Amino acid sequence: MNTQLINNQWQAGQGPAFASINPSNGETIWQGNGASAEQVNSAIKAARAAQLQWADTPLEQRITILENFAAQLKEHSEEFAVIIAQETGKPLWETRTEVGAMTGKVAISVKAYNERTGTTENPMPGAKAFIRHKPHGVVAIFGPYNFPGHLPNGHIVPAILAGNTVVFKPSELTPHVAQFTLSLWLKAGLPAGVINLVQGEIETGKALAAHQDIDGLFFTGSSNTGHLLHKQFAGHPGKILALEMGGNNPLIIKDVNDVSAAVHDIIQSGFITSGQRCTCARRVFIENSSNGDAILAKLISATKNIVVDDSFATEQPFMGAMISEKAALGMVAAQNELVAKGAEVLVELKQLKPGTGFVSPGIIDVTNVNDMPDEEHFGPLIKIYRYSDFDSAINEANNTSFGLSAGLLADSENDYNHFLKRIRAGIVNWNRPITGASSAAPFGGIGASGNHRASAYYAADYCAYPVASVESDKVTLPQTLAPGLIIE
C-alpha cells in the first residue's frame, strides 16, 4: 500500500510493517509499511524545496487553498466521520463533530492570523515603523490518536497559512485518518511539497524529530513523549517547539442547587470520548455535606446507566471503545493499583469484551489514599476526593505537576472568583464541563501540560516570528548631527 506522501507523490513505506485495528471489533482496517529514515529525509527535502515559493505565494491565494480544503471536508464529511469512528472507536455522533471542527478551523485561523500575526504600521519622525511576521520554514507536526483529524489540523492549517511547509507524522494508531486527510489536501490544490506525510511507529518519529533541517516541531500527545522532545530540543534554541500535553485535571463541586445539572457536567467532564481527552476531569472534589452526598449518589446511579456500544449502533451510545485493548487493560490495571493503595471502588471500571477497547466507566474514592500518584490516567475513571474546606480542596487540586484544565461547579460567583484567582491551569471553566474549549480562544496549560505555546487561536503565534522594521523611502542626513560627529 502507498502510505507515504512525499512531494505530492504517494509511495509505499520502506520501513517496518504496521497495521491499524478497529478497537470495537479487533478487525484490521489498514496496513502498510512505515517510512524509513531515508524517506523522512526525502520528505524534509521536499518541504524545504517548496518553502520559499509557498511563502512568496500571496496570502489571498494561500487562503483560497485553505478554503478549498474546508470545502473538501464538507463534501466528504460523512465518509471522513466513518473513517475516524472505525479507527478510534468513538461514536459516530462524536466523530461528525470532529470533522465539523476541522472545517471551522480554516476561518478561525485566518481571523487569528490577521489579528495576531498580520502587518501593522505606525508613523514615526522621518520614517515608518512596521511589524511583520515571517514563517519559520519547515515544521514537523506530530498528531495524537484521540482526535486524529482535529488536533493535527489545529497545527497544520495555521502553519500552512503562515507560509510554512509541513512534514506530518500522525499517531501509528490512526494512519487511515491521516491518509484520508492528506488526500483532501491534494484535492484542495496544495502545491507539491507543502505538506508531506510520513507514517510509522517510534523510529519514524525519532528520525523526524532529530533531523537537523527542520525549523520547528509542533506536538500534541503524552507528557512523557513531550518531555523527551523538550530535552532533545534543549540544545537547539533556534528551533521552535510547541508542546500540548496532558493533565491531571481537577473539577470541584461546591453548593450546587441543581444536582442533576452538576452530575451531567461531571459525566461530560470525565467520560466523554471514553475519558480520552487531555482536558478530561481526572479528579473530582465533592463536599462532605448533604448536597455532596446527593450529587455523589446521583453520579453513581447515572454512571451505571451510561450506554457503551459500537460506533455505528442505531441507538448511539455515549461512549464507544477506547483506542485499543491495551489502553482498556491499562485502565483496569490503574484502578487495581489505586485499590491496592487503599482506594474504594464506587463503580467498577471493567473491560466489557475481550479483544476490544470497550470498558465501562468507573468511579473510585481516593480520599483516604496518602500516596496518590500524580499521573494522567487516560480513560473513563473518575477519582473522587471528599472535602470539608474549600481552600483545602483548591490546594489539593493544585497539588499536581500538570496544569491544563480545571473547573468549578458552584452557584456562588464569589466562590468562582476566589477559585479563579487560586487555581493553576490554562483552561478554567465555571459551571461548564472542563472538556469544553473554544477554537476561538487559546488552548494550553502550564507545568507538565505544555511549554507556554498555547494552541487553537494562539497557534498563529508559534507559526510565524515577528520582524520589526524602521523604514524610510530615502536616506536622509539629519539636520542636527550627534555631538562629536562631523560630516563635510
From Swiss-Prot:
Disulphides: none
GO biological process: arginine catabolic process to glutamate; arginine catabolic process to succinate
CDD domains referenced in this protein's UniProt entry, alphabetically: ALDH_SGSD_AstD (cd07095)
GO molecular function: succinylglutamate-semialdehyde dehydrogenase activity
Protein's UniProt keywords contain Cell membrane: no
Pathway per the UniProt entry: Amino-acid degradation; L-arginine degradation via AST pathway; L-glutamate and succinate from L-arginine: step 4/5
InterPro entries hit by this protein: Ald_DH/histidinol_DH, Ald_DH_C, Ald_DH_CS_CYS, Ald_DH_CS_GLU, Ald_DH_N, Aldehyde_DH_dom, SuccinylGlu_semiald_DH_AstD
Primary enzyme class: oxidoreductase
Residues the record lists as binding NAD(+): 221-226
Catalytic activity: N-succinyl-L-glutamate 5-semialdehyde + NAD(+) + H2O = N-succinyl-L-glutamate + NADH + 2 H(+)
EC number(s) stated in the UniProt entry for this protein: 1.2.1.71
Active site, per annotation: 244, 278
Record key words, sorted: Arginine metabolism, NAD, Oxidoreductase
Family affiliation: Belongs to the aldehyde dehydrogenase family. AstD subfamily.
NCBIfam families: arg_catab_astD (TIGR03240), PRK09457.1 (NF006992)
Physiological role: Catalyzes the NAD-dependent reduction of succinylglutamate semialdehyde into succinylglutamate.
Protein name: N-succinylglutamate 5-semialdehyde dehydrogenase 2
Source organism per UniProt: Pseudoalteromonas translucida (strain TAC 125)
